[in-house]
Curated annotation (Swiss-Prot):
It is an enzyme of class 1 (oxidoreductase). One of its GO terms (molecular function) is flavin-dependent halogenase activity. Keywords: FAD, Flavoprotein, Glycoprotein, Monooxygenase, Oxidoreductase, Signal. It comes from the Eukaryota. This is Flavin-dependent halogenase ptaM. The keyword NADP does not apply. It comes from Pestalotiopsis fici (strain W106-1 / CGMCC3.15140). Glycans are attached at residues 159, 192, 204, 243, 480, 491, 523. One of its GO terms (biological process) is secondary metabolite biosynthetic process.
């Protein structure tokens, strides 16, 4: 089958974001073409999945296939941040007793979703790269950065090529950019990507065989382990996989990485092993009798965002729009959240439920808020990593970080985007984001000052090191209260509970889209909470 000359929705990129969007839309009867530059199976890092992945897969009836494939079951994750007891996020809190997600081999899991999109009716082509787009003028005053939108014109066609020398043009009504970090629209046409200066890291990783199982006989047996480096420069992941290997990677601040490399005079595998010594539990316990079975891989791990994730007839999803440090394994969660958002916002316009401006604004807001939730958490935990012995997210009395992680658990398991629309729970969440800290006798002025420092620290990371004890106290409570949620139903109905500009998502098979809501589920703090998230995101 050759790439058609025209389609209703063109999706660029066959990763989890693009393939999931193609699946959702194809199941709605939409004419979809999905183009992936590489040939499957292709390698990708990012093996640890959040609990929320089950909800997304369940929505498109793909959950059972993931189970049948035999991926390593993930019942939670363990975080060793300081010498205090490690914290464990138990997926039973969101998936029920015995509930699990997976650690996946991405070359396999990504291909499963890509092929499934084809089974659902999407026309899928791998080894087919989109080289450029053609735009037509789209005169509309509403599409501007003041509402986090962009207007380079309306994209109407794409030029593609294959390694066999063939090429062509495909016209479309809509385009969804899931091209990953290459970010076709964001980097080539909008030029609106900005990097978080406080989260410029480098990752080195490889795969081992013969590793010891973590914490045998305990509740968190064989869970992924994330251990802070002893020098405070970063962290190490250890993720067991179903092919009898374990993925082990070092994530370190770029400046610390190159300084240590220069001082040691080492490179490649020797330098990687030297850095691992700063994570003694992983190095001395899990890897004691293990051997490396792959080459050492390296990649920049810079967190970034964009000033807009949508415009006239286009949507950005997954890493094509934004990327946040992978400490909480948020990549595939954010990919599928944004893919679903793009799908419902496009269908809403196609079905006459709203105009294009409203649909685009709904999507860009949804993406920005999801990204910012993880950004705020990562920045705070990063400070705890750097300030090893100071209590940032725990108290002097606590022996570990279980209380802090219990409060942020709905976010780091992805449940904040997949829970039920219980009014009381949502109101409490909104009030928390509004930083209602009266019980700590913290004035609005002090709150604003700390938020300002957090914002500026993204351009001046050293500001995180200069917070006063009082500011540290305020920041810790902001984070804890921001993400204090309750356990609730196990489905995607929270996605429908969010109201943006008066519209909420409808996730009904055969009729997905947006609908006008007469009554908000949240009280007046919701808009202020959203404003805070947006304000932090703007400078990310």
């Amino acid at each position: 089958m050759s790439v058609p000359a025209q389609t209703s929705v063109l999706i660029v990129g066959g990763g989890p974001a693009g393939s999931y969007a193609a699946t959702v839309l194809a199941r709605e009867g939409v004419d979809v073409v999905l183009l992936e530059a590489e040939k499957f199976p292709r390698y990708h890092i990012g093996e640890s999945m959040l609990a929320s992945i089950r909800f997304f897969l369940r929505f498109v009836e793909l959950e059972e296939e993931f189970d049948r494939h035999g991926f390593e079951k993930k019942y939670g994750a363990t975080f060793k941040i300081t010498e205090k007891n490690p914290a464990y996020t138990d997926f039973a809190a969101s998936l029920g007793e015995g509930g699990y997600s997976w650690n996946v081999v991405r070359s396999e899991s990504d291909e499963i979703i890509f092929r499934y999109a084809g089974k659902c009716g999407a026309k899928t082509f791998d080894g087919t790269k989109v080289e450029s787009l053609t735009f037509e003028p789209y005169p509309h005053e509403g599409f501007d950065e003041s509402v986090h939108l962009a207007n380079p014109g309306r994209p109407v066609s794409a030029n593609w090529s294959r390694k066999d020398g063939s090429s062509g043009v495909i016209k479309f009504d809509y385009i969804i950019d899931g091209s990953g970090r290459n970010g076709l629209i964001s980097t080539k046409y909008l030029k609106n990507r900005s990097f978080n200066q406080g989260l410029k890291n480098i990752a080195n990783w490889t795969y081992w065989k013969g590793a010891k199982r973590f914490n045998v006989g305990e509740k968190n047996e064989n869970s992924p382990l994330f251990e802070a480096l002893k020098d405070g420069s970063g962290w190490v992941w250890a993720i067991p996989l179903h092919n009898d290997t374990i993925s082990v990677g070092v994530v370190a601040r770029q400046d610390a990485f190159f300084e240590k490399k220069k001082e040691s005079g080492l490179s490649g595998e020797a330098f990687y092993k030297e850095y691992l010594k700063l994570a003694p539990q992983i190095k001395n316990e899990l890897l004691r009798d293990a051997t490396i079975v792959s080459d050492i891989k390296q990649a920049t791990d810079w967190s970034y965002s964009a000033s807009a994730y949508a415009g006239p007839n286009f949507r950005l999803i997954g890493d094509a729009g934004c990327f946040v440090d992978p400490y909480f394994s948020s990549g595939c969660h954010l990919a599928m959240t944004s893919a679903l958002s793009a799908s419902v916002s496009i269908q809403a316009v196609r079905r006459g439920q709203c105009d294009e401006l409203t649909g685009a604004k709904w999507h860009t807001t949804k993406v920005a808020e999801g990204y910012t939730r993880f950004l705020l958490l990562v920045m705070t935990v990063q400070r705890q990593l750097r300030m090893k012995d100071k209590n940032i997210i725990s108290t002097d009395e606590e022996e570990g970080f279980d209380m802090a992680f219990k409060k942020i658990q709905p976010v780091i398991q992805g449940v904040a985007d997949t829970r039920t629309e219980d009014e009381q729970t949502q109101r409490r969440a909104a009030e928390a984001v509004d930083f209602s800290l009266e019980s700590f006798e913290i004035t609005p002025e002090k709150q604003a000052a700390v938020i300002s420092k957090i914002e500026r620290s993204q351009a001046e990371p050293e500001l995180l090191e200069k917070l006063t004890p009082e500011e540290v106290h305020i920041l810790g409570n902001i984070v804890n209260r921001t993400f204090e949620r309750e356990k609730d139903e196990l489905n995607l109905t929270h996605f429908t509970g969010d109201m943006i500009d008066g519209y909420s998502a409808k996730l009904e098979h055969g009729n997905i889209g947006l609908y006008k809501r007469e009554k908000a589920l949240l009280n007046g703090t919701a808009s202020r909470a959203a404003a805070v998230l947006k304000s932090i995101h703007q400078v990310a």
